[in-house]
């Protein structure tokens, strides 16, 4: 059962390209080594606002729960990832991470 990892970042006006570039340069290159398959970047609302934050949604897929725990261990042990998130936090208004699994009615 694959797991979806969703990052939601509230990005202030005029900073979207900067935050997206941080992900492209410093997070995405090693994501696959952590078992993460990048599936897309989205914004909501569907236009970049110039008077309020726009939410950048970064979506990844991991193969299963074991891959989630392995990824979390690797990220926890990485000073580069810690610095990446500090840099992101210096820009964004807020951020949230969600893990989603398919609901299987049993």
Language-model-detected regions and their locations in the chain:
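Generic macromolecular interface patches on structured domains
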Residues: 29, 68, 78-81
């Amino acid at each position: 059962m694959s797991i979806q990892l969703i990052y939601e970042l509230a990005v202030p006006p005029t900073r979207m390209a900067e935050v997206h570039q941080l992900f492209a340069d410093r997070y995405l290159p090693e994501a696959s080594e952590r078992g993460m398959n990048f599936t897309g970047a989205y914004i909501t609302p569907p236009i970049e606002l110039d008077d309020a934050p726009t939410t950048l949604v970064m979506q990844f897929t991991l193969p299963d729960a074991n891959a989630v725990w392995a990824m979390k261990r690797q990220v926890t042990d990485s000073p580069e990832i810690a610095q990446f998130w500090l840099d992101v936090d210096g820009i964004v208004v807020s951020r949230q991470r969600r893990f989603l699994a398919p609901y299987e009615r049993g």
